[in-house]
Curated annotation (Swiss-Prot):
Disulfide bonds: none annotated. It is a multi-pass membrane protein. This is ATP synthase subunit a. It holds the Pfam family ATP-synt_A. F-type ATPases have 2 components, CF(1) - the catalytic core - and CF(0) - the membrane proton channel. CF(1) has five subunits: alpha(3), beta(3), gamma(1), delta(1), epsilon(1). CF(0) has three main subunits: a(1), b(2) and c(9-12). The alpha and beta chains form an alternating ring which encloses part of the gamma chain. CF(1) is attached to CF(0) by a central stalk formed by the gamma and epsilon chains, while a peripheral stalk is formed by the delta and b chains. CDD domains: ATP-synt_Fo_a_6. The chain crosses the membrane at residues 26-46, 88-108, 132-152, 168-188, 195-217, 231-251. It is found in: Cell inner membrane. Belongs to the ATPase A chain family.
Amino acid sequence: MAGHTTADYISHHLTFLTTGQGFWNVHLDTLFFSLVSGVLFLFFFYRTASKATSGVPGKFQCLVEMLVEWVDGVVKDNIHGSDVRHQIGSLALTIFCWVFVMNAIDLIPVDFPPQFAELLGIHYLRAVPTADISATLGMSVCVFALIIFYTIKSKGLGGFVKEYTLHPFNHWAFIPVNFLLEAVTLLAKPISLAFRLFGNMYAGELIFVLIAVMYMADNIIPQVLGIPLHLIWAIFHILVITLQAFIFMMLTVVYLSIAYNKSDH
């Protein structure tokens, strides 16, 4: 462990494994656990699909079919164009499952990942990718790019320009004002998407760290109280990680449906 005081302990658990400097600073632990989460999700779905049967399905096949049908229903309720429904449906399913797996890493006891990393000579390690703003912002930027893409796909480049220059005031004199208002609204979508997921997961991770600090106390009372508190928060956090994955997926679908479905002004 990097330090022996409470402040050192908390700081150690909130420090990323990084490489590079300044703008080129890369959080290696975030990249690693993001990729591992994606591989686990793909492996689970591939394994289930390869063993799928038209007869009595297994429990994993039932789970996957329920997920696919549920996400497909969500997308159908929001996307009117059948030509893009399958594309956005696949994206929504990937987002929900991938974000859920990344969030679920937070249920691993906070000391396990850094202690295992210490055995490999790695002094700092944060295991929850969605507690890193760079990860959530990266995903949100991708959603932002898709919003632009589907707006142009649905309305054409001319319709895209018109939408952000002649609304809400349909007069050429208000083009600067319209553009400013629409640009703020558009940019707020990925920013709010990123910070909502990051804020909830960072807070959840920090609470687990603070509960772990109780085990370091000299008094036996906080040590004993730490056990039920950890269990209660872990159970509640299962709801949080699921809800945050759903919210990120749902907002992505809603934003893309607005981009694709909205009529020209």
